[in-house]
């Protein structure tokens, strides 16, 4: 089959949507399909379209539907789709109506959809390849934050929490991710000057991000909204404990009973939990154990199989996932 994958993120941009598109393209090619990843649909015939982001890919979705009304059309709902745009944005709402099937990236996403839309929705957890263990730093309790400096990510909550830690704490925050504008960059620089425990590293090659993640004691994801963050998948794969804002997308990734949630936007609660993880081995071990139990959700073989099931469902074909180990696409940047 010829499959067009549309993502609003250009090839030079290494955000979650682009990484998902490239990873899925690799899986689909391994399953025997011809795949083209595009920012906008180029008008060429395809047997199926996979569009990431209901609102931002709406123009491509609508044109494809009008040109190929009998051809399967799959729309993948992102965090801003699920937790903002589908409530009041006509383009996002129309994209969902036009879709043959919808995809959410964690199970809690289903709760945001009307019953008629849930009936045509698949859940596909994003996967991450295994990371070779790296010994943690001995003199520091290293905490990493991975994500671009965007408002939806609440990017500086961890820095603000670091400022509240007692002097005895060895916690240091290392933040990897590009600033989306000069205002965010200046704010990060100001916080670095003011808070010695916080260091903004900026955008980094994917291998460096993974190496620093693997040696970290904790990864913090502080977002106001998440569709199903791939950085959580990376942390689970690496065996790194997560402290997360208590938003639906994070709960869908880590489970309702996970012990590492803090009230979103509350740096005081985050600081308390970070210090508790640093100083209480039983709590830290609990987080490790619970994260290990979620690792099965983010295996490449499972994501590939779920993707094959989706294609089969919309085309009426039977497609088998490869039984051999799956090689992994290697993005240049991943933040």
What are these regions (language model features)?
Residues 15-16, 133, 282-312, 316:
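A charged, aromatic-enriched C-terminal amphipathic alpha-helix characteristic of glycosyltransferases
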Residues 256-267, 276-281:
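Conserved acidic donor-binding segment of nucleotide-sugar-dependent glycosyltransferases
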